[in-house]
C-alpha cells in the first residue's frame, strides 16, 4: 500500500517561490558579485642614500705571500689573562676567539700563573693579557717566568692599554722598555699603516674624526724597534701608533700593544688580523667569505604585508647588481605551498610573477602550512612534506639542492628525530641550518654538526624580521641597522664566519625593501674597507667546505634542552622537563679500579638511584665519548626514570676518553664527579688479566703483559695503550678540569674502598649532602669471594663472576717495569693532590718515597 502524504497547496506554493529566489540570488552572486580582495594602497619605497666609499681605490692590497708567525714546539692554544671573567671587553675577546674556533684557556689575573709547559712542549702559542698595566706591575717572579716562556718558545703577546682620565701626565715611558706612550689623546685621523700583520685590513685606508670625539686614545712613539700597525694623527700633525708591534729586539719577546679597546671597528679588524698572524698558516687562512641570503616563507604573510609584482622585479634586478660585489650571488627562496596566492590582488599577482620567474632563483622547501615539526610525528610530517613537494613540481620550482629549512628552526636543535627521518625520505635532505645550536646567543658561538646524515650549518640573523618593512618604523631607529652595517655586528658576522647563511623574510623585500638596502650597503662597506672576497656557492658545497675546515664539529655537542627557554619551547612532548631525568653524579672510573662495587654500594642509599641497565655495555650507559652518544639526549634521559635526591651513573670508560669531559660538561655542567685512584701498575695488570679472560687474541698470543710492553707490533702497542692510559691520572684530570671545577670532584682511594667500603660510602654520601645511612649494616665481607658484597634481606648479593676475578700475583720484575713507566705520572699526581690539600693514598705515598 502506498501512503501519499497530504500536501497543502497554500504551503507548497510559497516554498517554491522562496527556492526560486534563492537560486536566482546565487546566480547573481556568481555572475555579478566582485569577489576580489581590495588591495591595500602602496606607497613608493622610501629612497635612502647608499653608502659611498671615500676612497677611489677599492681593490685589495693584501700580499699574495702572507707572513705567519712560527713558534718553537707549542700547542695551538691561547692563554687569555683577563681583568675579570665578567669584564665586557674580556667577553668581546672571548667571543672573537670562539668565532674563529681557536682553542683557549681564559683566567682572571691572579697571584699565580697557570702551568705554561708540559714535560715536552709549551702549552700555548699566544698570550693575550687584557690589561697591559697588570702585566707591567706583575710580581717579578711571574713576569720573568712569562717573559722567559715567550722568549724560549717564540710566543707573541697581545695586550691593551687605556688612558687614565685623571692622570695629568701625557707622555710616559713604559716600564722596562724604551717605548714611549701618550695618553688622553684626541685623534683626527685613523689610518692602516704598512705591516706584516695586515690581512683583512686595506693598507692606506683611513677615516676622519671630529673635534667632538673623546680624547681618550693612547698613542705610541715608533722607532726601529717598534713598528706602527695602526696610526693616529693628532691636531699638531704628528702621526703616532694606535697599535704598535714590539719586534722583540729589546728582550726577545714580540708584543702587539693596542692603545684602544675593541669597540672601534678598525682596531677590531687589526686584532683579527693579528690573531691570524699569530695562530694561522697559509693553509688555514683565506680571504674568501661565502654569503647566502635565504628569503624564508616567500608566500607566507598577512594580507597587506606581502611582496607585489614591482617588488619581484626589483628583486631580480638587484640580484644582478649584487653580483658586482658577490661572485655568483643568487637569492635562495623558501616556500610553504599552502600560502600561495593568499594575499590581496596585487600580492597574488606578485606570487604569480615570482613563480613565472622561478628559474632565476634557487628554491628550498619549508613545510606545507608552515608547520612546527615538534608538534607532529613522522607520518604527519611525511604527508605535509609530500604536499609541498607536489606543489613545487606543479609550479615547476627548481629545487636543485638537498637543502631545507624548518619553520622557526623547529626540530633541528634540539633534534626531533622524526623530522630528520621525514626530510631524508621525502626530500633526500642532506643540508639544513639553524641559529639555535648550541644556543641562539652569543651568535659568535654558533656551530655546525652532522646528525642522521644531515649536515647542519650555523645560520645568522641580520636585524630584519617579519615586522620590519619601513625605514621610519624600525625599532630604535634605522640608525641601529646602519651602525650594524658600517663596522658593527652585521659587518663582523661576515668577517668572522667563513660561511654566512642569513635569514630574511619576504616582508623585508616589500614596501621600503629594507633587506635590499641592508645587503647592498653591507657589501659596499666590506668592499671599501677590507680585502675580503665575497662569493656565493650552493649549500651542499658550503656544508662540505664547513666540515672540512671544522672536522671537530661533526659530532653534535648535546645540551640540556630544559635549561634554554628557546629550546624548551620547541621540545617534542616525549621530553618532559618537569621530571628530573639527568644524573647529578658521574662515577667516571677509570676501569678496573672498583667503580662497579662503588656504584653498587651507593645504590643501597634510599635517596639515590642509578641508571637502568643498558644491554651490550656491561650495564653501563657509556654515553659520553661512545657510540651511544649519537643516540641523542632523549635516549640518554630515558635511562634515568627515577627522581631520587641523587641520580647517578657509572661508566668507567669516561675517565680517559678524550671527548667525554667536554660532552659531559655541555649536558650536565653541574654534575659531581667521582674518580677512583688505584696504583696504576696494579690497575694495568688487572686490565691485562681482564682482556685475557675475555680472550683478546693479542693478549692470548702474548701470554703476559711483560711481552706486550716489550713488543713493537702495532697490535701490541694498542693493547699496551689500553693498559697504561687509565693510570695516567693527571694527564686525563687536566682535561676534566678544563670543564669541571675541582670542587665538583671527589677522589676515592681504591685500596680504602676495597678494605673499608662503609667508610668510603659514608664520606661520599656526606659530600653529596645525603641523609645519614648505615652502610655498615648492608655491606658484608664474603670470605668465599674475597671481597665485600651487599647484604639484602639477610642474604649477601655479590657482583658477577667477572668482578673480583682471582689471578696470579704480579711478578716483581713486571711491577718494577710498570712503576718505572708510571713514575712521572705518579709524581705529578702526588704534587697535584698535595698542592690542592687533598688526601694522598698510601700506595702513592710509598711510590713517591721509593722513587725518592
Swiss-Prot record:
Q: In which pathway does it act?
A: Glycan metabolism; heparan sulfate biosynthesis; Glycan metabolism; heparin biosynthesis
Q: Give the residues the record marks as binding 3'-phosphoadenylyl sulfate.
A: 592-596, 686, 803-807
Q: What is this protein called?
A: Bifunctional heparan sulfate N-deacetylase/N-sulfotransferase 1
Protein's cellular compartments: Golgi apparatus membrane
Q: In this UniProt entry, which residues form the Lumenal topological domain(s)?
A: 35-852
Q: How does it assemble?
A: Monomer.
Q: What is its EC number?
A: 2.8.2.8, 3.-.-.-, 2.8.2.-
Q: Which residues lie on this side of the membrane: Cytoplasmic?
A: 1-13
Which cysteines share a disulfide bond?
789-798
Family membership: Belongs to the sulfotransferase 1 family. NDST subfamily.
Per the record, its GO cellular-component terms are: Golgi apparatus; Golgi membrane
What are the transmembrane regions?
14-34
Q: Which organism does this record belong to?
A: Caenorhabditis elegans
User: Region entry Heparan sulfate N-deacetylase 1: which residue ranges?
Assistant: 34-574
Gene name of the encoded protein:
hst-1
The residues that carry sugar chains are 50, 72, 261, 328, 377, 428, 576, 607, 712
Which Pfam families does the UniProt record give?
Answer: HSNSD-CE, HSNSD_N, Sulfotransfer_1
Which residues carry out catalysis?
592
MF (Gene Ontology): deacetylase activity; heparan sulfate N-sulfotransferase activity; hydrolase activity
* Superkingdom, natural source: Eukaryota
Q: Which reaction does it catalyse?
A: alpha-D-glucosaminyl-[heparan sulfate](n) + 3'-phosphoadenylyl sulfate = N-sulfo-alpha-D-glucosaminyl-[heparan sulfate](n) + adenosine 3',5'-bisphosphate + 2 H(+)
What tissue expression does the UniProt record report for this protein? Present in some specific neurons in head and tail regions and muscles.
User: Entry's PANTHER family?
Assistant: BIFUNCTIONAL HEPARAN SULFATE N-DEACETYLASE_N-SULFOTRANSFERASE, HEPARAN SULFATE SULFOTRANSFERASE
Positions of the region Heparan sulfate N-sulfotransferase 1?
575-852
Database matches in InterPro entries:
Heparan_SO4_deacetylase_dom, HSNSD_N, NST/OST, P-loop_NTPase, Sulfotransferase_dom
- Give any single GO term for biological process: heparin proteoglycan biosynthetic process
Q: What does this protein do?
A: Essential bifunctional enzyme that catalyzes both the N-deacetylation and the N-sulfation of glucosamine (GlcNAc) of the glycosaminoglycan in heparan sulfate. Modifies the GlcNAc-GlcA disaccharide repeating sugar backbone to make N-sulfated heparosan, a prerequisite substrate for later modifications in heparin biosynthesis.
**Membrane topology term:** Single-pass type II membrane protein
